[in-house]
Amino acid sequence: MKSAEIREAFLRFFEEQGHTRVASSSLIPGNDPTLLFTNAGMNQFKDCFLGQEKRAYTRAVSSQKCVRAGGKHNDLENVGYTARHHTFFEMLGNFSFGDYFKRDAITFAWNFLTSDKWLNLPKEKLWVTVYASDDEAYDIWTQEVGVPAERMVRIGDNKGAPYASDNFWTMGDTGPCGPCTEIFYDHGPDIWGGPPGSPEEDGDRYIEIWNNVFMQFNRTADGVLHPLPAPSVDTGMGLERISAVMQHVHSNYEIDLFQSLLAAAAEAIGCSNDEQPSLKVVADHIRSCGFLIADGVLPSNEGRGYVLRRIIRRACRHGNKLGAKGSFFHKIVAALVTEMGEAFPELKGQQAHIERVLKTEEEQFAKTLEQGLRILEQDLAQLQGKVVPGDVVFKLYDTYGFPMDLTGDIARERELTIDEAGFEREMEAQRERARSASAFGMDYNSLVKVDTATDFLGYDTTEGQGKVIALYKDGQSVEQLTEGEEGVVVLDRTPFYAESGGQVGDSGYLQAGAARFDVRDTTKTGGAFLHHGVIASGALTVGATVDARVDADVQHATSLNHSATHLLHEALRQVLGEHVQQKGSLVDSQRLRFDFSHFEAVKPEQIKALEDIVNREVRRNTEVQTELTDIETAKAKGAMALFGEKYGDTVRVLSMGGDFSVELCGGIHAKRTGDISLFKIISEGGVASGVRRIEAITGAAALAYLNAAEEQVKEAAQLVKGNRDNLIDKLSAVLERNRQLEKQLEQLQAKAASAAGDDLSNAAVEVKGAKVLAARLDGQDGKALLALVDQLKNKLGHAVILLGSEHEGKVVLVAGVTKDLSGQLKAGDLMKQAAAVVGGKGGGRPDMAQGGGVDVASLDQALALAVPFAEQGL
């Protein structure tokens, strides 16, 4: 039975038991910022188990893609060396949210595993564990299912504390928890190992295939377990493990899914397809890398991106070890798509993107991999003992891009370990240097503590009345602000938009009789809106009623830029690919800035395509529509949500151009797309590894920008005595004439240098039988001096030469030694000494060297080194 067939059978079985099939969630957890990657089937249902979210179903089944690499759950260092460790795996799971409990969960599991309609596993091969005091589960297994007592094992608190057990699950020190029951498969007496709970349980004979967790208690801080009103079930069965059982193999790498990837890896590398751990590493890592990139992660030096980079570089190193020539890793993506693309369509849709990202990362790492490996070999050759020092590990990380675990991998192959504590000390020292070099600012919002919330009126109006419910000065609550004092005003209701979602806060003023407070910015803490500004006149007190007026012109310009940002986001996905995700934005009245995930610079023709798409939507002049709904309905309509953003029960969906752009957004926007008038991109560049930034302008600012550009074109045309139509031809002619003149100048300089060479040769002095010449030729560039040194070497025959020049405000130096003397005197050594005198650097071959510096006043002193240099060396 193939892996794909097992996956589908599992999903179909539970659908027949009334479960709703739920698609795998992203590897980037959308509802848990504490989690690096999705690592279990229950992650996407966490809020359901906690009672914080209600769904249309109470029974669910899924095949969840999971990654365990980095953070608490890190299998990276074991991958390739064991039969069952992976960075990526699939978790089959069925779930009950206050619906069925132990009896049904146990019966479902047993029927799926043993029924001849489904997996038809021999019952006598299955062992079961339960928590020691869970008599209910034990009785269901023995009395209702019929598992004999000799294949039942009670597991107590085997981890040194109450409820610390392999068979008791907890979400944390407090909160939902409960016993679990695990099903094991016995591979037979030919494999070493003992049953669960025995001293030999770590062997490979008895393998856990399914875990059923019964969330039945809530543990309080005092350690007491209180029964939950609606117990739930969370189960998990690794697809790779059950596939190994069904295909009668003992290693996950022997199942059909991995066999195709191993073959593809061997072909891409150009090695034999055997049992080498390095080949298993590559086959495993293509899965995690492919799926992470498909879900929007790009290689970088922090967070999820750094974990991805570590996995890619580990795969590259193991490919290099197997003899890979050039980049190979990206070539395996096609096999991954063939194997898993049907179950996970995002792989098919992102194949070209995944290949490009991997190829780019491979090529970048290849530049330092060989050099780093040589350095490591040198350090290991000098190593005394069995531990690689932390400073060596850090040097490889900091200089050559070797993640710590990659160096650890290499050390492990030599039966060495690495000094992780020493590495961390070096890292902390680097962080401290960075902190010392940083400027620190204070988060003023964090000083303001307001319990009440502000009602926002700004979607419908730019003015309204509100009551002052709090005033702050220097972060401290006050009863009054007087003329000239800066502070923060909190109202019970306001038309001012508070900074969020990339849109800056509104400005304007608050008026209460003679008192006027000029609002410079608006922010938010909790549910309270903070109006930051200064008292322009009078005094403002707590309890006063104010007329709040937003600067409507500034807000309108900001709203146009915000709407244009949404149109740009969709245009980027159409032009560059669906891998594009928003990484940040800043929208004010002057311009918009949009950061997004992409692996290379946006090409000029792509910039034009982006502008064309956005301006097309602007010309369509469609209504900008908003709708309040729940998050699941919004996602079903295709609304884009930002990863890591926490959304409430009700969300605001913003649509433009019908379904052209549909996003969750709480910002202020144009009424119609035509209000934007014009969209123009003014810059594009990189801000971090895998993150690009576009800046653009709209409306009157865009028109002014184009008018200024038109004026520059006219001025340029006048300078070359042309017009708009023939400007390019005129400029091309000027540049060609300039190239010809530069060529003529070089020829004249060469002739002048040649003539000077005849005169200079007469200025050489004799030192111990050799001619030594040092001369200053201001105005000559390095190219001319090189040619002259060559000429003088031929003319003098047995010589040491040092020429210098002041050229464009800097010192240029060239040294030469005839080959018959280069065994005794090195031109590079002379250059290092001379360049140091003029505050620069230099070097080169024994017979020819170049250098320079910035201290023109010391040039003569540098040239004077030639004679003593020759005297000492001859």
From Swiss-Prot:
It is an enzyme of class 6 (ligase). It comes from Pseudomonas entomophila (strain L48). It holds the Pfam family tRNA_SAD. Catalyzes the attachment of alanine to tRNA(Ala) in a two-step reaction: alanine is first activated by ATP to form Ala-AMP and then transferred to the acceptor end of tRNA(Ala). Also edits incorrectly charged Ser-tRNA(Ala) and Gly-tRNA(Ala) via its editing domain. Consists of three domains; the N-terminal catalytic domain, the editing domain and the C-terminal C-Ala domain. The editing domain removes incorrectly charged amino acids, while the C-Ala domain, along with tRNA(Ala), serves as a bridge to cooperatively bring together the editing and aminoacylation centers thus stimulating deacylation of misacylated tRNAs. This is Alanine--tRNA ligase. The lineage of its organism: Bacteria, Pseudomonadati, Pseudomonadota, Gammaproteobacteria, Pseudomonadales. Belongs to the class-II aminoacyl-tRNA synthetase family. GO terms for cellular component: cytosol. The gene is alaS. Binds 1 zinc ion per subunit.
